[in-house]
Each structure stands twice: as structure tokens, then as C-alpha cells.
């Protein structure tokens, strides 16, 4: 097997993670989970990855033990999926799902190290892109698997039994991934062969585009440890410019808005609109495909135009599209036309997310002083994950009262974030114009 053979094993695990990202919330709804607790489920999942990334990243950095850490993380993910499939107790499902995303976060910084093996530093950003590609296709494959499996088996087996059987299949996929990884992962390097963490962080910071894993589960933890390992909060805070401070305030606000929308959404689609599990998977897949198809195009636009301006456009679109999902449900409930319109809305949500995600790294890099650019990118990852988790819990609470209220608040928060980014955009443009030399 060539040096990238282990990536096939990780792609297989990504299939299980992609399917599980929606399957577990749908299973939670099917066993009677309420709206607020669904928000807690999503919030715990969003927050669980960061501790895993920091713990496993530090161990891998200090000891060089990569193989055992990857296998341990895959083992924890397998255990988590089995635990969820064997219980109908909401708190146990929340705990199992938290363990799943702890494991997913834990393996991410270790894979970042593995993908650089045998290559020179200048090629590392391209290697990170290879890892993201395998992971992204696996994630999308998991959504396709969920769509097909639940559409075919929910009728004969019943909704809960079909979902449990898919959880078992996902657990088996991660278990097989661990077996293949044990065969194909490269050996742990000697101390002399280990790349310095500062070089890894520098290469990650050069990767100007953040990975777009999914419009529905946007935060990846692969960067978090490497970009924050040398973080000194006081030093970084002292170097924050007013524009960067405002931008991070915007990030908090619009990621809370994203969480408010996605947190209670599975329950709204399945219970309020009466969509079958396969149809919900289809909508999420459409959103992820929209992101994937627009990723390169958004990157090309960001190289020609202001990333801040493009991000404002993406945020304004999301601000309108979040309440649009509830409006479609009110105006065209449980109709073929309503379903088709929702499909278009979800595709546009994915496109808008691609624009936001691709431009984020460029905006942070432009606003941060050179000395703290890596740390600023790490803070972006950490803040976005935490804000998304808080938003998910808030969305679950609001959705318990009214989904139109929840999605309206989500849109309003994203709109406020867009206004703050527009302030940064205008301020940056003014500085750029005023700093241009006068012509003779």
C-alpha cells in the first residue's frame, strides 16, 4: 500500500461520522427527545471536539505516538456508536454522541501530523488539502448512506429499528477503519524525524482556506491544537487591533446564530413538517453538496474581491435563509412544492456557508498582525465551536416555544454579525485607501 493508503481507512471512518452527524439527532427525536434536549445534544457535540483535539494533539506532539492515538480515537468512536444504538435513554444518547465527537476532535490533530510524513514543508498545505478531500468525500458518502438506508428500511423495519441498524453499520465501519489503519498507518517517527510543532503551525497558517467539511457541522478541530499550543492570551490580546476585535465579536454572534438554526432543525423537519428520515438526510446532503461545489469558486472570488465584502454577502444570505425554512413550512406545509422549495433553500445555505468558510481565514489573516496570525486562526476555530454549541442550546430552548421564533432569532443574530463584518470591511477599505502613496 502506498503512503496514502491509510487515508482510505480515514475516509471510511468519515463515512460513519458524516452519517452519524445527522443520524444520532434523528434517532434522538425518534425515541422521544424534546426540543431543548436536542439543542443540548448538538451543543455538547459542538463543544466536545476541542478538549479531544487539545489532549490528543499535545500527547502526539510530545511523544510522537501517532498510531496508538489514532487507533484509540477510532476505538472510542466505535464504542460511542454502539452505546447510542443500544439505548433509548436521552441522557445516554447525549453522552454517547459527546464521546463520538470527542473522538473525532481527538484524531484530527494527529492526522494533521500523519499527512505531512515524508514530504517537505513547502508541500504541507497541499497535503492538508488531500486530507480534507478524503474526509469530505467520506462525510458526503455518509449522508448518502443515511439517505438510502433509512429510505429503504424505515418502512419494513420501522423508523427506530432502521436507525439502530444504521448505527450498528456505522460502528462496524469505524471498527473496520481501525483494523485497516492498524495495517496501513506509517510507523511512528523517531525523535529526529518529528516535525517541529512551530513548522506545522506555520504551514497550517499558510493554508488560507478553512476546510469545508459540512454546512451543517462546520467546525473542524484539526487546526486547533497546532495554532494554539504556544498561545499566550495576554500577549495576543495586547496585539489585537480594533478591527480584529470587532471581527471576533462578529464571529461569536453569527456562529451563535448558526447554532440556533441547526440545533433544533432535525426535530422541526421530522416532527413539525413530517419528513421521513431519508428526506431529512437528502436536505442535509443537498446543503453539503452546495458547499462542496462552491468551495473552489468562492476561493477564486476571494482572490479577486474583498474577502470581508464577500463574507458580508454570505452572511446576509444566511440571515434571510434561516427564517425562510420556517416560512416555507408555514406557507407550503408537507407538500411536494414545499419540499422542493426547501431543497433550494438548503442548497443556498450550503453555498453561503462555502463563501463564509473560505473567506474567514483570509479575513483573520489580513486583520491579525504577522506575529499572532497562527494564534488568531486557532482562536477563530475555538470561538466558533464554543459559540455554535451555545447557540444550539439556545435554539433548542427557543424551538420549544416556536420554531419560527427560533429561526427568526437565528437570522437576526447572523444579520448582526453581518453588520459587524461590514464595519470591519469599511474600516479596512478606508485604511487601504488612506495608506496608498500619492501619485506624482
What is each stretch, according to the model?
Residues 1-47, 243-283:
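Helix-loop boundary and gating motifs at the non-cytosolic
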Residues 52-65, 294-307, 399:
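Helix-to-loop junctions at the C-terminal end of transmembrane segments
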Residues 11, 91-107, 252, 337-355:
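Hydrophobic core of transmembrane alpha-helices in multi-pass small-molecule transporters
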Residues 40-58, 282-297:
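Central cavity-lining transmembrane alpha-helices of secondary-active solute carriers
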Residues 146, 150, 171-194, 205-219, ...:
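C-terminal membrane-cytosol helix-exit motif in multi-pass small-molecule transporters
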Residues 129-150, 383-391:
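Glycine-rich segments within core transmembrane alpha-helices of 12-TM secondary carriers
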Residues 96-137:
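Cytoplasmic helix-loop-helix junction between adjacent transmembrane helices
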Residues 68-83, 309-325:
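Structural signature of the two symmetry-related core transmembrane helices
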Amino acid at each position: 500500500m502506498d503512503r496514502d493508503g491509510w487515508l482510505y481507512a480515514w475516509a471510511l471512518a468519515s463515512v460513519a461520522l458524516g452519517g452519524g452527524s445527522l443520524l444520532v439527532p434523528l434517532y434522538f427525536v425518534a425515541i422521544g427527545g424534546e426540543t431543548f434536549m436536542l439543542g443540548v445534544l448538538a451543543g455538547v457535540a459542538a463543544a466536545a471536539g476541542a478538549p479531544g483535539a487539545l489532549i490528543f494533539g499535545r500527547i502526539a506532539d510530545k511523544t510522537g505516538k501517532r498510531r496508538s492515538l489514532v487507533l484509540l480515537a477510532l476505538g472510542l468512536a466505535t464504542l460511542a456508536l454502539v452505546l447510542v444504538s443500544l439505548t433509548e435513554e436521552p441522557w445516554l444518547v447525549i453522552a454517547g454522541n459527546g464521546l463520538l465527537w470527542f473522538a473525532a476532535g481527538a484524531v484530527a490533530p494527529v492526522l494533521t501530523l500523519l499527512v505531512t510524513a515524508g514530504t517537505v514543508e513547502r508541500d504541507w498545505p497541499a497535503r492538508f488539502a488531500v486530507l480534507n478531500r478524503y474526509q469530505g468525500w467520506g462525510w458526503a458518502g455518509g449522508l448518502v448512506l443515511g439517505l438510502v438506508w433509512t429510505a429503504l428500511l424505515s418502512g419494513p423495519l420501522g423508523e427506530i429499528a432502521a436507525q439502530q441498524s444504521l448505527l450498528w453499520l456505522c460502528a462496524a465501519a469505524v471498527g473496520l477503519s481501525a483494523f485497516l489503519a492498524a495495517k496501513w498507518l506509517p510507523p511512528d517517527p523517531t525523535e529526529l524525524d518529528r516535525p517541529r510543532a512551530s513548522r506545522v503551525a506555520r504551514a497550517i497558517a499558510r493554508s488560507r482556506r478553512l476546510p469545508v467539511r459540512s454546512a451543517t457541522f462546520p467546525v473542524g478541530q484539526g487546526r486547533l491544537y497546532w495554532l494554539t499550543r504556544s498561545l499566550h492570551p495576554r500577549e495576543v490580546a495586547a496585539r489585537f487591533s480594533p478591527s480584529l476585535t470587532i471581527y471576533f465579536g462578529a464571529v461569536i454572534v453569527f456562529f451563535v446564530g448558526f447554532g440556533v438554526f441547526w440545533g433544533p432543525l432535525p426535530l422541526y423537519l421530522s416532527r413539525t413538517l413530517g419528513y421521513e428520515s431519508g428526506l431529512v438526510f437528502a436536505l442535509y446532503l443537498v446543503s453539503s453538496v452546495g458547499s462542496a461545489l462552491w468551495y473552489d469558486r468562492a476561493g477564486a472570488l476571494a482572490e479577486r474581491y474583498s474577502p470581508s465584502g464577500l463574507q458580508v454577502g454570505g452572511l446576509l444570505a444566511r440571515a434571510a435563509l434561516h427564517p425562510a425554512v420556517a416560512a416555507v413550512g408555514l406557507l407550503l406545509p408537507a407538500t411536494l412544492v414545499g419540499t422542493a422549495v426547501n431543497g433550494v433553500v438548503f442548497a443556498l445555505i450550503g453555498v453561503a456557508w462555502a463563501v463564509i468558510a473560505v473567506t474567514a481565514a483570509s479575513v483573520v489573516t489580513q486583520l491579525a498582525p504577522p506575529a499572532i496570525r497562527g494564534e488568531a486562526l486557532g482562536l477563530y476555530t475555538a470561538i466558533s465551536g464554543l459559540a455554535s454549541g451555545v447557540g444550539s442550546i439556545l435554539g433548542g430552548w427557543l424551538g420549544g416555544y416556536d420554531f419560527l421564533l427560533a429561526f427568526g432569532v437565528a437570522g437576526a443574530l447572523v444579520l448582526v454579525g453581518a453588520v459587524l463584518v461590514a464595519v470591519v470591511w469599511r474600516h479596512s477599505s478606508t485604511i487601504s485607501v488612506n495608506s496608498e502613496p500619492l501619485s506624482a
